[in-house]
Amino acid sequence: MHPQNYDIMAEKDLNRIKVVLVEHKRTNKWLAEQLGRDQATISKWCTNSAQPSLEALIQIAQCLKVDVKELIRFPENENQND
């Protein structure tokens, strides 16, 4: 990844946890209980003010029975050949 791309990505939402929770009619509180995490942590992940670890993303995907890729927002214009 080029440095200029990092600056652009830093300003965008990197995960779709909140969207996927809504699609599955689940709440932050439910996810916090499932993961044994503080509700404030889940809230930060859902608002993209903090990002979960890869391990946490995998656990979230398992709880929601989705592919982990559904929880990640990919930049639309990123050139994968660079």
Positions of predicted regions on the chain:
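Recognition helix of helix-turn-helix/homeodomain-like DNA-binding domains
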Residues: 36-52
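DNA major-groove recognition helix of helix-turn-helix/homeodomain DNA-binding modules
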Residues: 55-70
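Short, charged recognition helix plus adjacent turn
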Residues: 1-10, 19, 24-25, 44, ...
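Short glycine/serine/threonine/alanine-rich loop segments
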Residues: 26, 37, 66
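Residues in the helix-turn-helix
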Residues: 30, 41, 70
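Secretory-pathway ectodomains
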Residues: 11-17, 37, 54
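Short basic helix-loop element that most often maps to the first helix and adjoining turn
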Residues: 15-34
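Helix-turn-helix DNA-binding elements, focusing on the entry/boundary residues of the two helices
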Residues: 28, 39, 54-57
